[in-house]
Amino acid sequence: MKPNILVARAVFPQILTLLEQHFEVTSNQDDVLWTPAQLIAQLQGKQGAFTTGSQRIDAQLLAACPELKICANMAVGYNNFDLDAMTAVGVLATNTPDVLTETTADFGFALIMATARRMAESERFLRAGLWNSWRYDMFAGSDVHGSTLGILGMGRIGQAIARRGAHGFGMKVIYHNRSRLDAATESACGATLVSKTELLQQADHLILVLPYSSEAHHAIGAAELAQMKPTATLINIARGGIVDDAALAAALKQGTIAAAGLDVFEGEPRVHPDLLTVPNVVLTPHIASATMPTRLAMAKLAADNLIGYLVHGEALTPLNPQLVKA
C-alpha cells in the first residue's frame, strides 16, 4: 500500500504526477489558504507533507497528527518548522538549499539596483502622468558601481551576491557573519570580514541574507539604522522579523537612511502599514526565488525528499539528519 501524503499548496502538475507514482496524494491544487485547524484536519492519516513555508508545523499540530513522518519544505528557509518539536517526535524536516542560490542572488542584486536608482518611485511618477519636463536632479539616486556593498550573512547566497558586486560592479565588499570564511572563499568573493558596527557604518548598500533565528530577531532596528549612512540603502531578502519594520518605516520617513528594498516582511503576507505610505521603499511579495526553472527545481527537490524518505528511508537535504537511517 502506498503511503499517504498531503500537498499543502498548489504545485507544478509534473511534480504532482511524480508524487502520484509513489503515494496516495491529497492535493490542494485550488490553493486554499488553510487555517491551522484545517491543516491538521487535512493531515489526518498522512505520513508525509509537501509544505511551502507558509504552513506552521509545531508541537500542537504534531500531537494531532501522530502518523506524520516527514515534512518537506519547498523553501530554503524553515522558520515555519518547530525543528525541536519535530525532532522530539521523530518527524523529519527537509528544505531546498542550493537550487535557488544564483536566482536569489540575481534578485537581491536587482533589488539593490532598483532601490539605489529609485526605479519604483520613478515608475509610479510616470504612470501617474506627472512627467512633463527634465530636471537635473529628477529621481537622482546613488551609484552601485564602485560603492561599498555590505552583506550580513555570508552563506551560499551571500557569497553569490558578493561575487556579483566585486567582479561585476567593482564594489568594495565587506561582510559580517557568525564565522569567518576561509581565505580562498574570501578571495573568490572579493570580500573582507568586518564587525557588525563597521558593516553598518561603512556600507553604501547593506543587504541581509542571514537565516532567521531568535538571535536574529530585529537584528536591524532603530539603533542599527541610526548607525548607517544617511545616503545608504537597506535590502532584505532574508526573512521577515530580522528587520524591525516599524523602525525602518520611521527611519525612511525621517531620512535616517535613503531608501530600502524589501522582499520579506514581519508577519507576512501582512505588511506594516507605514511601509505602504513611504515612497522611498521598493516592496516585493517574497519572490526572490521566483523563476520558473528555479521554482521547479525547488519543487522537485522537495518531492525527491518525500520519495527518498518514505520509500527508501533516505533524504537529500535533511534538517534533522539524526532521524535518517545510517
What name fits each language-model region?
Residues 97-148, 160-164, 168, 183, ...:
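Phosphate-binding beta-alpha-beta segment of Rossmann-like dinucleotide-binding domains, i.e.
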Residues 167-186:
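NAD(P)-binding Rossmann-fold cofactor-contacting core
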Residues 150-153:
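Conserved N-terminal Rossmann-fold NAD(P)-binding element of oxidoreductases
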Residues 157:
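Hydrophobic/small residue at the entry helix of a nucleotide-binding pocket
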Residues 1-94, 221:
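An N-terminal-biased, well-structured beta-alpha scaffold segment characteristic
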Residues 8, 51-52, 74, 111, ...:
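Short, well-ordered coil/turn residues at beta-beta hairpins
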Residues 93, 231-326:
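Rossmann-like dinucleotide-binding domain for NAD(H)/NADP(H)
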Residues 57-59, 180-274:
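Rossmann-like adenosine-cofactor binding region
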